[in-house]
From Swiss-Prot:
Keyword match Oxidoreductase: yes
Keyword Transmembrane: no
Any one Pfam family match given in the protein's UniProt record, by short name: PMSR
Gene3D superfamilies assigned: Peptide methionine sulphoxide reductase MsrA
Organism lineage string: Bacteria, Pseudomonadati, Pseudomonadota, Alphaproteobacteria, Rhodospirillales
EC number: 1.8.4.11
GO molecular function: L-methionine:thioredoxin-disulfide S-oxidoreductase activity; peptide-methionine (S)-S-oxide reductase activity
EC top class, as a word: oxidoreductase
SUPFAM superfamilies to which the protein is assigned, alphabetical: Peptide methionine sulfoxide reductase
Name of the featured protein: Peptide methionine sulfoxide reductase MsrA
GO biological process entries: protein modification process
Keywords: Oxidoreductase
Cross-referenced InterPro entries: Met_Sox_Rdtase_MsrA_dom, Met_Sox_Rdtase_MsrA_sf
Length: 160
């Protein structure tokens, strides 16, 4: 098994996207990339922790590659937006790839370069590529949030 960590806006929708990928064995939403230990959602949203809303993705590399997960990451959000996704504004919604080893760092950089060179985007990529640090799981009510809301109301909430 292997782990990847991505930030691409509101973690509810990002988690939902990765959970659907064959070979992904688990997801955890949480906070990473900041300087505050064991932050709460309220603290992260206040903008004082430096953390991003992120998703830790556990996967079987025999069934899905890190490069394939990177492709999902790029397609799941607008990587040209700085510290936001859609109407969600703040550095907690930034686009970031948190690499866990040198292989992931190289793959993330190469993937970003391919996307930049493709001409598919009209603006510069704002995605940060940073080493993975401590990951603080979000409160339980955030885990699989879209699934929980769909089960409760019959409708999946909108998420950017």
């Amino acid at each position: 098994m292997a782990t990847a960590t991505f930030a691409a806006g509101c973690f509810w929708g990002v988690e939902e996207t990765f959970r659907k990928i064959p070979g992904v064995t688990g997801t955890t939403v949480g906070y990473t990339g900041g300087h505050f230990k064991e932050p709460t959602y309220r603290q992260v949203c206040a903008g004082d922790t430096g953390h991003a809303e992120a998703v830790r993705v556990d996967y079987d590399p025999d069934k899905v590659t890190y490069e394939q997960l990177l492709d999902v990451f790029w397609a799941a959000h607008d990587p040209t937006q700085v510290d936001r996704q859609g109407p969600d504004i703040g550095d907690q919604y930034r686009s970031a790839i948190f690499y866990h080893d040198a292989g992931q760092e190289a793959a993330a950089g190469a993937s970003r370069a391919r996307l930049e060179q493709s001409g598919a985007l009209s603006r510069a990529i704002a995605t940060r590529i940073e080493p993975a640090g401590p990951f603080w799981p979000a409160e339980e009510y955030h885990q699989r949030y879209i699934d929980k809301q769909r089960a409760r109301t019959g409708v999946a909430p909108a998420c950017h």
